[in-house]
Amino acid sequence: MHARILIADDNRDAADTMGMLLELGGHEVIVAHSGNQALELGRQCRPDVVILDIGMPDMNGYEVARTARNEDWGKSAYMIALTGWGQADDKERARMAGFDRHLTKPVDPDLVEEILKGHLVGKRS
């Protein structure tokens, strides 16, 4: 099962690497390098899954998630926070912003694929 995935991270290497790994898994990947660009691309491509870095400079991941959840395309997207911040209050803040999952960097690509599979199987059943 494959998904259309939007990745947003201001660290170009991290975003591009994650994107390449997900493409190897058969997913369609769109990469953004800012929060504003993520919203723009989300409106255009209507992703199934959004993976957002929290610490982006122009618009952080919390703001992007809150904004997306209030837009038609973002209401049904599965949102994953991918961040270096992993304390309990960070996870709660992510949940309150509308994220479905919170993963702490560095993340195991196999874990991301496992989460995606679980989400896609659940979505189709």
Give residue ranges: language-model regions.
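Alpha4 helix (beta4-alpha4-beta5 surface) of REC/receiver domains from two-component response regulators
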Residues: 19, 63, 70, 75, ...
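Active-site beta3 strand of CheY-like receiver
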Residues: 45-51, 56
